[in-house]
């Protein structure tokens, strides 16, 4: 099984702890598990596009799994943007007659971008111009900037409930696997 995680949460979202791990579950079911670990981009990567991430990420990982297990068709699972990349790669593979994939599973993956939903609250021409300017100067959109937008999309869960509990009520939240990594 090849796991293709998101760029932001990385591989560990699928392997948080022994009792909260897709990797451990799959290994326990007898599968050999491979997982892409995306490196953090820098300013030198500013010109990389989706094609590059598909070719140097998804396709390179499929090649590596194929070299390790040449007689086995690959079950691939993509999470979030990793699933979007996997969808594009699988479509191209189908077009090209590349039959290395046994199955494709998508977890929280975006495939239809015609309606941005709540994200459209944060997207307008001036906001896009500001983001493009910041990305051009830094070479990338920084994780903190993306995380802030995601927090605003789920502000009751990710911002206000914690603030109310921690600061106003004086109750400390129990540690959880995700927050240990984040």
Where are these regions (language model features)?
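Alpha/beta-hydrolase-fold enzymes
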Residues: 67, 71, 85, 89-182
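Extended hydrophobic secondary-structure segments that form protein cores and membrane-embedded regions
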Residues: 2, 76-77, 104-109
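Short, surface-exposed "cap/lid" segments of acyl-processing enzymes
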Residues: 1-42
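Short coil/turn segments at beta-strand junctions that form active-site/ligand-binding loops
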Residues: 31, 71-74
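Short, glycine-/Ser/Thr-/acidic-enriched flexible segments
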Residues: 6-9, 38-41, 60, 81-82, ...
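Gly/Ala-rich beta-loop-alpha elbow adjacent to hydrolase catalytic centers
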Residues: 78-82, 86
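Alpha/beta-hydrolase active-site loop
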Residues: 45-68
